[in-house]
Amino acid sequence: VFKLEGSDNIKLVVDELPNFRTRDLVVMWGTIEGEPFYFLVSHWPSRLGGKEASQFKRDACAKQIKEIKDELIAQNPATKVIVMGDFNDDATDASITKVMGAKGKEKELVEGDFFNPFNQMLRAGLGTLAYQDVWNLFDNICVTENLVNAEEGKLRIIKGKKFYGNIFTRPYMLQQEGQYKGYPLRTFVTNNFQNGFSDHFPVYIYIGK
């Protein structure tokens, strides 16, 4: 059971655009079975105007999240940090792998690193949203190395049959026919109500001992 100790919202800053407004970073902290956890939830700026032209905005978010994580680990190396959200970048994009420093393989991890279990899932052809028949994986959950290489008896990320990450899908969540068969069933297409749930599939991980 997660015991909440506090929460806050942090303004995401893009240095090149001091007046730029985007969604805040929502954070909360507390304990699970006595172990310190810190959660960050973030929805990064869109690719409006093109991926490359808007990249610096998402890079700024990634940089700020890494700085927060580094400070938390420096203060208490036992803190287990989890960041999640729609990053509007794929798990293999440089904003996540380079700027935020999230590694895709356990063997690459060093103390304090982020691990992104969805990196290998994207490389295997899985995704949470599709555009022009190409799957993307913008929805990520990254955890600090101490949730991968946890001490015996401590909480850790649990691996499934093949991956540490999971994408939740059910038939009622899928477009059943037409050009977009197999895509997530959206709530709206332009102004037309589709009675769907989202244009993204949700993602999740398991934490246990």
Residues of each region from the PLM?
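Metal-dependent phosphoester-hydrolase catalytic domains
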Residues: 20, 73-79, 89-209
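Intrinsically disordered, low-complexity segments enriched in polar/charged residues with Gly/Pro
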Residues: 14-17, 69, 181-182
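Structured beta-strand-rich core segments of catalytic domains in phosphoester-bond hydrolases
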Residues: 1-36, 40-44
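Second-shell loop/turn segments in exported
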Residues: 14-16, 49-58, 83-84, 126-129, ...
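Extracytoplasmic, non-cytosolic globular domains
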Residues: 26-121
